Amino acid sequence: MEEGTLCAMSELSSGKITIDAPISEVQVALFEVAKYPEWSSSIKSVEVLATDEQGRLTTGKFVIDAGMMKDKVTLDYEWADAPSKLSFSFNDADLLTGMEGSYSIKKIDEDTTEVTYELGVEISMPIPAMMRKKAEQATIDQALQQLKSHLEE
């Protein structure tokens, strides 16, 4: 894989959820990446390594524990499509060899927002593609449900 390219994953797993919260509140929750451990049980900690001129995280080191995906992962965040989309890509990890994903945010009405989460991972150990996809989907479903619970409480 060439430096700076996205992971060579066949296709990303994805999930979608409708949240009873204004789009501005959803954006705040998703854009404050360093606060993910407050609502996502699979993200144990986030260390901010770099930010842009607006103070948004551009590189962060995450301690994740999502079933078979337990690792310390450094991710780069891309803000070019914000505020409608936040993307991240793999930088470094102990076990994972690739990770990419995004949160897409769409206003349904004044008090309702739809969030689509796409995720793909590559792992250094041999794991059947079906198991990897199942783990990705479980991670997506859990993250979306926890985001919804966090915003609707």
Language model regions located:
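Hydrophobic ligand-binding cavity/cleft-lining segments
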Residues: 2-55, 142
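Generic recognition of short, well-ordered alpha-helical segments
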Residues: 31, 100, 130-131
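Hydrophobic-ligand binding "helix-grip"
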Residues: 37-38, 45, 50-52, 65-112, ...
